Structure formats: C-alpha cells, structure tokens
C-alpha cells in the first residue's frame, strides 16, 4: 500500500468516524458546521463565474439556482423530502449602470454571487440541523432551534477570509522568499513570481483534492454536477426531467472552478508588473490587486466563452480539467433537486414579469 493510499484511508476514516449514540446529536451538529465551513472555502469553485441567464451553485444536500430576477434553493432532507425556498433577485447591472463597466462588473458580480451563495449554504446547513432536533414532548418547553446563528456565520466568514489570505497569499510568498535566500536565482522578478504562483496553485489543488476525500463533500461535488447538467439541459431548450438532465455533461465552461483557475494564472503575470522586493510590500500588492485580478479574470472568461478557438480559451482549459474533481456524476435524486430549484426560480421569474428566451 502506497503512502498516498494510506493517507487517503486515514483521512476518510477520521472524517467518517462512527460516533457513540449518546453524543450523536452534538457530533452531528459539529460535523454539519465542519461541512458548512469547508463548503464556504469552496464557494468560489462551486459558484458560476458570470452573471448569466441561468446559473447555480451546489450546497449541502441540495442546489441553488438563479435566473436574472429570482433565485431558489432545493435541499434533500434525511427523510427524503425536498425543502425549498425562493426569493426575488435584483440584477446588479440593471440597478446600477456603472456595475456593468468592464473589469468592475467582474468584482461586483463575484461579490454578489458570494453573498447569495453564502446565504444558500446557510439555508442548506439549517435544513440539515433541523432534522437533528427531535420535537419537544407535549407540555414541555419549546427547545431552542438548532441553526447557524449570526455569530457563527460571522466567525465563519472572518475565518474563511483569513484562511484564504494565509493559504494562498502568505504561505506561497513566504516559501518563495525562503527559496530566494537559498538560491539568488529565485530573486529574479519573473522566476520569483512564477514559483510563487506554482506554489499557490499546488496548495489550491491539494485543498481541492483533500476535500474530495470526505464523503460529505463528495456529495456536494455530485450536486455540483447535477447543477451543471440541469443548466446544460435548460440552455439546450430540452425538458427538465431526470432522464434528460442525466444525459448531459458535468463539465461546464462557465463554472466557478474555471474562474478560480484563471485567477491563479492571471495573478502570476500581474504580479510580475510590480517590481517590489521586500516581503511585506509584495504581500500588500497581493492583497490590494485582488479585485483587479478578479475583474480581469472575469473579462477573460467572458471573452473565452464567446471565442472558443482563441488563446484566452486555452487559459480556461485547466479549469475544465479540474472539474473532474469538483463535479461528480449525480444520483437521480440529486438531479431532481437541481430541477426543482430551477423550476422554482423560473416560476418566480415569470411572476415578476421576466421571460427567458433561449436563442
């Protein structure tokens, strides 16, 4: 047995450890929080990378779908029932024209998508927690509802931002700086930023691969595949039934995974344009330029989607390859959740006077 196989078995065993019955509810609550935290880290990879006609996101045991003016979420309860929720949605580029400007629109779209995605994840986590709570006996005081409270969500956001900065900004920069001390060749502007980018990419791929070993997150990746299949069926104008949806691919060019990979690649070249030499100056540049890199990556994704044979389209190819991990073939019940979510979003869209036409 190889070391990698042993590590995978140990990791899977630890995450799926059988629990004593008397501690089951508490530990399931903590496990749900852990799933919620990991899913928040994966949020950009699970989200769509554009403000499109129809898009979506995988959540815990469910799928969120959005149309131009509505969004809906469908989550599978442990009982087998599907819990749904839908709300109207304002399209940013229609509300504020300046939000549709090139580069800036990418930053605003991602921020809006992340906010909506976090709300969807919180809803799905609360659905899972609701099933853990047994009903109060007749005459007994009402039990406090198990849910992701405001302070838990706030701590999660702060921790997630800190994790992102430490994992993908601080650590690669620190490692490359230490390599520069070992060999001066790593101090050259091009070499330094190239190595820094490769380390950052390696950490990202390691994180994605590591999360895929956890059964709960593998199911999130299956729902991600269900979301892609359903969007493909809708874009082709086909009926939204399980058999039809299952006939489509799980790999979608506008996936957030492709967007993240583009961000990783573009950042290498952008950092090369700023010849700062001290550690903290380089670190500051990486934080300050994050919105610019996000906006540029968004424009490249848009251009590549319209010009499939261009050089920019090749830059999005690694994201499609990575979807072999972040999307998995869904079960019929998972595809059904994606269909229900899209149906609810479409119904609300029509109620608000919207009309979706596939050209």
Language-model-detected regions and their locations in the chain:
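Divalent-cation
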Residues: 20-137
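Membrane-interface starts of transmembrane alpha-helices
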Residues: 148-156, 184-199, 278-285, 289, ...
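Select subsegments of transmembrane alpha-helices in polytopic membrane proteins
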Residues: 150-168, 252-263
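Polar-ligand-bearing catalytic/cofactor-coordination segments
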Residues: 34, 45-55, 59, 63-65, ...
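Hydrophobic alpha-helical membrane-embedded segments
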Residues: 70, 98-123, 196-221, 293-306
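Tryptophan (W) side chains
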Residues: 10-14
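Juxtamembrane "helix exit" motif at the C-terminal ends of alpha-helical transmembrane segments
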Residues: 123-127, 160-185, 263-285, 294, ...
